[in-house]
Amino acid sequence: MTLVSFFTYTARTLSKERKEGSLAFWHSMPISDSKAIAVKLVFALVIIPIIASFLLLFADLTVWFVGQWFVPQSLLTDYSVNLVALGQHYGEFISTMAAMSLALLPVACIIFFISQFNEHPLITIFVIILLIKIMGSIVFNSTVIGDWISQVNNLSINILMSDHPWGTLMAIGSPTLMGLLIIAVTFFVLTVRFRAGK
């Protein structure tokens, strides 16, 4: 749910501004383009996961509450359905979301940039990735570039599925993490400049 909401929001929020004409309104307000983009990033990478965590907490508490009334205590103990386990589960989810949000930062910046001049940024990114993989394989006669792109592309999913999300994030290596940070900053700046009409 978090990933679906993330991709839906990032793909539509900036293009929606241009379609509805609200961009001119926001430019008339005392809010810089960099702050506006930063707020959208915070919503995509922080607020959406927090909302998802509240839904998870509500579901866990509902299971616990129903269990107290209708399930034998011995069965609840066997399946670790108690407040301590629920708290631990919630904490693990928050930790996973934090690691995943860091992995999604460059993705969000790239989507924001492409979505300003393309109505289907996700399809565009998919095609670009496919072309890079094919060209890398043809030109260099190697799948190294394609393998690296796949590793980065699947990072958020791997983190989500991992029992050790931070270990999965760090496992891609410091050079790759630094490269992703540079990509994020570069596309953030490009997005701000494009939104400002520069």
Regions found by a protein language model. Give the residues of each.
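Secretory targeting signals
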Residues: 1-8, 39-116
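Residue-level signal for alpha-helical transmembrane segments in multi-pass membrane proteins
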Residues: 5-12, 57, 61-62, 136-139, ...
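Transmembrane helix boundary and interhelical loop/hinge segments in multi-pass membrane proteins
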Residues: 7-27, 41
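Perimembrane helix-loop junctions in membrane proteins
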Residues: 13-16, 20, 63, 67, ...
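Short helix-to-coil transition segments within interhelical loops
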Residues: 28-32
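Terminal transmembrane helical anchor/hairpin motif
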Residues: 75-198
